[in-house]
Amino acid sequence: MNTKEYWNDIDSRLEQLVKYGFVKLPSLKEYDLDRLSNQVSIEMGALTFKESGIAHKNFLNNLNINEYLTPKLFNIAQNAFNYKGDSLNQYHIARKVEPGNSKEMYRAHFDSHLFTMVIPVKIPESAEENGSGGLIYFPNARKMPSNEISNFIGKAFHKKYASKEGLDKFSNAHEKKEESFMDYQPLLFIGNTTLHTNHAVLSSCSSYRLTFLAHFFDPSPKYGVGSLLRLIRNR
């Protein structure tokens, strides 16, 4: 896979990100995802989440994320969102959901980071509609938080929608989008203004579901809402 060609039109895609709040990137089907998913799955074992595993970091390095994407996102963060931190403020985590996992579904939330990228690594097949844990997201669901207090209040207020019924209600007044990732195109969106969650990975799925979640630039202080929530969740 030619990584330079992969990022060839990133400037125009990032224009869409700023304009619409989200953008899809080119497919990763040319990458050896089967080998990658096997490596990551072995590293993770029974874990649902694992931060910056060896195979995960190797993938990010192979894709040259910090050469082709991070500097451009950093520029947007500074100029469009008045970000004052540094470009190393990143959080990379693998998420593996086994078929029938009843916990990892409809947990709607905002991220604390400015940008979130969902990278599909292994997407299972399911005979049932929305049965393979696809992403549900609402771009521009809230305004950019101006401080930690507004960030906390916004997160707390939207927790009432963290259920299937709540999401159905929220979608009556907000644009809902869904992404199965069967095309293996990563999705990049504004993390702290996009309410997002996942459908369930049903027991009938052909395999586990594995994605990489890349988070860029948390504008909150070191012990802000996002950091504390990650500490509580132990990840």
Language model feature labels by segment:
Residues 22, 114, 209-213:
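Short hydrophobic/aromatic beta-strand or adjacent loop that forms the aromatic wall/cage
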Residues 55-62, 89-98:
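Short, glycine/charge-rich beta-strand/loop segments that flank catalytic centers
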Residues 92-93, 117-119, 212-216:
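A structural signal for short, well-ordered beta-strand segments
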Residues 150, 156-235:
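Catalytic core of Fe(II)/2-oxoglutarate
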